[in-house]
Design a protein with these regions (language model features):
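A conserved acidic beta->alpha catalytic loop
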Residues: 11-20, 66-67
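Acceptor/aglycone-binding surface of glycosyltransferases and processive sugar-polymer synthases
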Residues: 31, 35-39, 43-53, 58, ...
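Alpha-helical membrane-interface segments at transmembrane helix boundaries
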Residues: 187, 191-193
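Conserved beta-strand segments of alpha/beta enzyme cores
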Residues: 6, 31-33, 159-161
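Alpha-helical transmission elements in cytosolic ATPase-linked domains
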Residues: 17, 21-24, 49, 75
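Short beta-strand/loop segment that forms part of the nucleotide-sugar
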Residues: 3-14, 35-36
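Acidic-histidine catalytic/liganding microenvironments
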Residues: 25-29, 82, 193
Length: 193
């Protein structure tokens, strides 16, 4: 099967050459579009902006550092097209390559948020997922100011199939998620749910 598709890159105020690369891609291929923030507004704002500008029947969220394996997309598309799901989500089965303290805090975060919340957020869940248009529209209808996408994905209640994969090292660059930034993000997630 062949599908029409577009790439929508969200440049979250990067200080490298990301915007130049996005512009070049757009000039070479009109299916490559981009949104460029004036400064870093954070992951949640980038996800929301991308979803808001998306137009497809199916929409995938994935990190551009290739820690979310693009090779899973054909399987994800097949599941949404042939099975009765509105979302195919991914989770890492291991945190191989991560500092042990970071893995410990991530595990504790999921344990705590699932204990105090009415919804379950899968341990190891990534933002990498493929969603139907009705799933995306439902997310966009939530006018949360302080968004926590992993919680919102679960809260909207659509049928989701989970695919597991081994942790993948990033292809280039370094994470901007310091321990403190992750800690504050987890506080936001807990207070949002």
């Amino acid at each position: 099967n062949h599908y029409n598709f577009e790439f929508l890159f969200v440049d979250d105020g990067s200080s490298d050459h990301t915007l130049d690369i996005c512009r070049d891609l757009n000039l070479k291929d009109s299916r490559c579009n981009y949104i460029s923030f004036s400064r870093n507004f954070g992951k949640e704002a980038a996800i929301y902006a991308g979803l808001e500008k998306s137009t497809g029947d199916y929409v995938a969220i994935m990190d551009a550092d290739l820690q979310d394996p693009p090779a899973l997309l054909p399987e994800m598309i097949k599941i949404l097209v042939t099975e009765n799901y509105d979302s195919v989500a991914t989770r890492r089965v291991s945190r191989k390559g991560e500092p042990p303290v970071r893995s410990l805090f991530a595990h504790l975060f999921y344990k705590l948020i699932n204990k105090i919340s009415d919804i379950e957020i899968m341990d190891g869940a990534r933002d990498y997922r493929l969603m139907s248009r009705k799933f995306v529209d439902s997310l966009l209808s939530l006018r949360e100011y302080n968004r926590f996408s992993k919680g919102l994905f679960a809260w909207v209640g659509f049928k989701t199939k989970w695919i597991e994969f081994e942790n993948v090292e990033r292809v280039a660059g370094e994470t901007k998620w310091s321990f403190w930034k992750l800690l504050f993000y987890s506080f936001d997630g807990i207070t949002a749910f």
